[in-house]
Swiss-Prot record:
This is Transcription factor RFX3. One of its GO terms (cellular component) is nucleus. The keyword Transcription applies. The gene is RFX3. It is found in: Nucleus. It comes from Macaca fascicularis. Heterodimer; heterodimerizes with RFX1 and RFX2, and RFX6. Belongs to the RFX family. Transmembrane segments: none annotated.
Length: 749
């Protein structure tokens, strides 16, 4: 605002300018003062103006002169640029909250047109321009034809206006008004407006009561809380949603922010409700679409109970689906390459097996998209013609019509015969790898994106049950087929466990990387580390180039100093991996070199952590957390890079040693032509180490980094242990080695 005064009797001229950041073509109004003699009959003594009047608004400036709204003449100076604000014919509105020494310019209602062509209609609103910024304060837009989507935090003026409104309507005291400021900030931090979504009013109030309880604040009543929400989030509408007799009022147009901790609270409450649900009710859920012709057989009576618990689970499932990538589809399955038919089978039987298995995999994908994991066990039992040896209650798993239909297309006897053929085994293994990779990308499309804790726990429970479900469903199938199928599903389960753990670490580390004080402490502690000594000790094992290690150290410190986001760190790790493996691209030794890089990365990072531990670094906990995250994410990157280089899926790469019969010295030497392995073989042959120690070294190279993680979580399962091979029995010692996909186990005899 600029104020110029003259000594004339006609008074001074007050120039009001509305300054809007990055806005063009705003008309400037020059308000001229009218002589005092013309105002005598219009003067009214007003101590304080509390409300906005459309016909009579006064400026009180100083203690002598009073100007009335009706006697002010205005002149508009238009700009030549395109006008972004066009004046309506409505009356002018002025803010009178400021002191006499400060005048705030208020522009009347406008039709705002953004440069992007997005219109925002505001009826009865105000544009307030002050030294703190430009704010839009408007009334409720219940019947407005336009909608305003708030994507940023409301202005301080909006918060003050909301508190003032509650003070007038409810007579709040000054102490209560100060408490409202924290309540309003909590609302703005955890909620946002959005189109097409709604939240129950009771849910919002429950969240508010919990917040007040945790912070020992006095809550307002539900009615005042409703006014508070409407004053902050303008444009909210109220709808009554739900079935007859069980409907509730909802705020339409508001949702919990994706990064709000209320998401985890809400999911945990829904998960507990699901855990308390009776088992017979859980089995009544059926997919949104009839799957593989067996959905009706799993629904019991097929009737909805209408209980609130079921509605909670259904709502939870629908809410979780927004975190999935339902656009994924099954890849095309290749043809069965078979030269000679097994006895008693025809090519029609093979085609029937292909079509049935395709339908079976599509059914699995459908129930996973709908988060009905328990139905997968029934689908497996149906396809493999599960027949329990001792029926418990005389009930059947599926309807006889469904089984008879599948039996008519491919009898079980022929299915068992085909399962013994090597070509069928290989074809079905490839199909499983493609299907499981699609399921992983559906459930966890982005390992760094936050996932609700209830969904994470459901996925981990699902992964824990997979092997048992499949083994039980294939009780009458040839053992070779069972081993092939279990190896693939084990790789799938292990991938789900790893990715959910990686996601959990990512969310924990995200908070650390956003904390400025922790970042500064980490930098100070890292600068005290003697990297020359670390490199000297690690060089004997890693044999890394000194210049490359020094460059990584510099880049790491610079990235940390810039307070990079988690996504920027992920890009940095990907660049490190690409640079390290670039010399091996297009060579047969690439998978082996990738595994060696993982080992070297893990060893070098452990040396840095050791130095921080010995120095009692204050930020040791933060470094330990991000070290775990970076190791896991580097494993994730290498896994996908090897899959890309070999033309396979990451599930197939991880399941390479999942087939336990394949773990033999002959298969471990399949990269015999690679330079890396040849050098290691020569060093082992020339060494004078005992045979048992050399064999231990060879076998340990076959397993990727992190293979012991499932062992730490669930232990080695007996069903995954290899039959004892004679070549693993060392006659000079009393040790028998048993190898599994999850690590090495030694049993003394």
């Amino acid at each position: 605002m600029q104020t110029s005064e003259t000594g004339s009797d006609t008074g001074s001229t007050v120039t009001l300018q509305t300054s809007v950041a990055s806005q063009a073509a705003v008309p400037t109004q020059v308000v001229q003062q009218v002589p005092v003699q013309q105002q005598v009959q219009q003067v009214q003594t007003v101590q304080q103006v509390q409300h906005v009047y459309p016909a009579q608004v006064q400026y009180v400036e100083g203690s002598d002169t009073v100007y009335t709204n009706g006697a002010i003449r205005t002149t508009t100076y238009p700009y030549t640029e395109t006008q972004m604000y066009s004046q309506n014919t409505g009356g002018n509105y002025f803010d009178t909250q400021g002191s006499s020494a400060q005048v705030t310019t208020v522009v009347s209602s406008h039709s705002m047109v953004g440069t992007g062509g997005i219109q925002m209609g505001v009826t009865g609103g105000q544009l307030i321009s002050s030294s703190g910024g430009t704010y839009l304060i408007g009334n409720s837009m219940e019947n407005s034809g336009h909608s305003v989507t708030h994507t940023t935090r409301a202005s301080p003026a909006t918060i003050e206006m909301a508190i003032e409104t509650l003070q007038k309507s409810d007579g709040l005291s000054t102490h209560r008004s100060s408490l409202l400021n924290s309540h309003l900030q909590w609302l703005l931090d955890n909620y946002e407006t959005a189109e097409g979504v709604s939240l129950p009013r009771s849910t919002l109030y429950d969240h508010y009561l919990r917040h007040c309880q945790e912070h020992k604040l006095d809550p307002v009543n539900a009615a005042s809380f409703g006014k508070l929400i409407r004053s902050i989030f303008m444009g909210l509408r109220t709808r009554r949603l739900g079935t007859r007799g069980n409907s509730k009022y909802h705020y339409y147009g508001i949702r919990v922010k994706p990064d709000s901790p209320l998401n985890r609270l809400q999911e945990d409450m829904q998960y507990m409700a699901m855990r308390q649900q009776p088992m017979q009710q859980k089995q009544r859920y059926k997919p949104m679409q009839k799957v593989d012709g067996v959905a009706d057989g799993f629904t019991g009576s097929g009737q909805q109970t209408g209980t609130s618990v079921e509605q909670t689970v259904i709502a939870q499932s629908q809410h979780h689906q927004q975190f999935l990538d339902a656009s994924r589809a099954l890849p095309e399955f290749g043809e069965v390459e078979i030269s000679s038919l097994p006895d008693g089978t025809t090519f029609e039987d093979i085609k029937s097996l292909q079509s049935l298995y395709r339908e079976h995999c599509e059914a699995i994908l459908d129930v996973v998209v709908n988060l009905q994991f328990s139905l997968i066990e029934k689908l497996w039992q149906t396809f493999w013609r599960y027949s329990p040896s001792t029926p418990t209650d005389g009930t059947t798993i599926t309807e006889s019509s469904n089984l008879s239909e599948i039996e008519s297309r491919l009898p079980k006897a022929k299915l068992i015969t085909l399962c013994k053929h090597e070509s069928i085994l290989k074809w079905m293994c490839n199909c499983d790898h493609g299907m499981y990779q699609a399921l992983v990308e559906i459930l966890i499309p982005d390992v760094l994106r936050p996932i609700p804790s209830a969904l994470t726990q459901a996925i981990r429970n699902f992964a824990k049950s997979l092997e048992g479900w499949l083994s039980n469903a294939m009780n009458n199938i040839p053992q070779r087929m069972i081993q092939t199928k279990v190896a693939a599903v084990s790789a799938f389960a292990q991938t789900l466990r790893r990715y959910t753990s990686l996601n959990h670490l990512a969310q924990a580390a995200r908070a650390v990387l956003q904390n400025t004080s922790q970042i500064n402490q980490m930098l100070n502690d890292l600068n005290r580390v003697d990297f020359a000594n670390v490199q000297e000790q690690a060089s004997w094992v890693c044999q890394c180039d000194d210049n490359m290690v020094q460059r990584l150290e510099t880049d790491f410190k610079m990235t940390l100093q810039q307070q990079s986001t988690l996504e920027q760190w992920a890009a940095w790790l990907d660049n490190v991996m690409m640079q390290a493996l670039k010399p091996y691209e297009g060579r047969p030794s690439f998978p082996k070199a990738a595994r060696q890089f993982l080992l070297k990365w893990s060893f070098y990072s452990s040396m840095v952590i050791r130095d921080l531990t010995l120095r009692s670094a204050a930020s040791f906990g933060s470094f330990h957390l991000i070290r775990l995250l970076y190791d896991e994410y580097m494993f994730y990157l290498v896994e996908h890079r090897v899959a890309q280089a070999t033309g396979e899926t990451p599930i197939a790469v991880m399941g390479e040693f999942g087939d336990l019969n394949a773990v033999s010295p002959g298969n471990l030497d399949k990269d015999e032509g690679s330079e890396v392995e040849s050098e290691m073989d020569e060093e082992l042959d020339d060494s004078s180490e005992p045979q048992a120690k050399r064999e231990k070294t060879e076998l340990s190279q076959a397993f990727p980094v992190g293979c012991m993680q499932p062992v730490l979580e669930t232990g080695v399962q007996p069903s995954l242990l290899n039959p004892i091979h004679s070549e693993h029995i060392v006659t000079s010692t009393q040790t028998i080695r048993q190898c599994s996909a999850t690590g090495n186990t030694y049993t003394a005899v």
